[in-house]
Amino acid sequence: VDDWEVVEFPAIIEDKEGNEASLWPEFWPLEELQAKKASLDVRYWNAQYLQNPVSEEGALIKREWWKIWEDEVPPSCEFTIMSLDAAQEANNRADYNSLTTWGVFFNEETNNYNIILLNSIKQRLEFPELKELCIQEYKDWEPDAFIVEKKSNGAALYQEVRRMGIPVGEFTPGKGQDKISRVNAVSDLFRSGIVWAPDHRWAHEVIEECNDFPSGANDDLVDATTLALMRFRQGGFIRLPSDEEDDMVYGIPGRGKKLYAI
């Protein structure tokens, strides 16, 4: 294998600023490729058009561990968390910002609390645009908690959003924890079959990026996911059979149902 040089030709290429272009515009215009991307399963698009197939053997969060919520209306959630993984630099459009919204609900079929992905946004935005997005999403979802890791661009956003009256919280998953340690800290939730996602393309992008980690090209959605799920776990909203028994009772009075993001 070492004697071979791997040559990849992704259908869509990006420059350092994050601008997209077709590799062969005379044959595949960018607009047609984007339409093709929207019509294909994420894993097939990554493998066939981006030349980036990923084996599931090394996945820390396997796609098969996710549960798919097929109802168009999500369950009534007792507590919701919005989590943001901000780009490293405030004015760098080459980096992604990932904003996810999650809810915890009681599953009557399994008689325990489960987690569901309610919304996910992954975009390249400069700081003013990111701030506007966070404010609008907070108004739309009215989460019980909005958490940002105070590093790089997230620290500036944390201060700015708080000044505007949004009760954003600082959350550090663990001093010195690397990305793999964070994923390992929540992988049991997926393996136990208590994490759900709706059958929408944006949700499948989260599933595929988690499956591709740590060998995938991007991990922004992975960071936002682990941030929220570690908060659920550390806050005591979700318990597994392996957790130690205690006398604490968790839960917040039910909230009304809300449609998924489209």
Task: Indicate residue ranges for each PLM-predicted region.
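ATPase catalytic-site recognition across NTP-hydrolyzing enzymes
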Residues: 16-87
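Catalytic phosphate/metal-binding cores of nucleic-acid and nucleotide-processing enzymes, i.e., regions
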Residues: 74, 79, 103-106, 155
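An active-site-proximal beta-strand-loop segment
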Residues: 84-97
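Generic detector of well-ordered alpha-helical packing
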Residues: 86, 150, 220-221
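Helicase-core coupling region on the C-terminal RecA-like lobe
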Residues: 48, 53-56, 221, 241, ...
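Acidic two-metal-ion nuclease catalytic site recognized across multiple nuclease folds
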Residues: 228-262
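Charged alpha-helix within mobile-element recombinases
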Residues: 209-233
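Mg2+-dependent endonuclease catalytic cores in nucleic-acid-processing enzymes, primarily RNase H-like
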Residues: 1-23, 27-35, 52, 56, ...
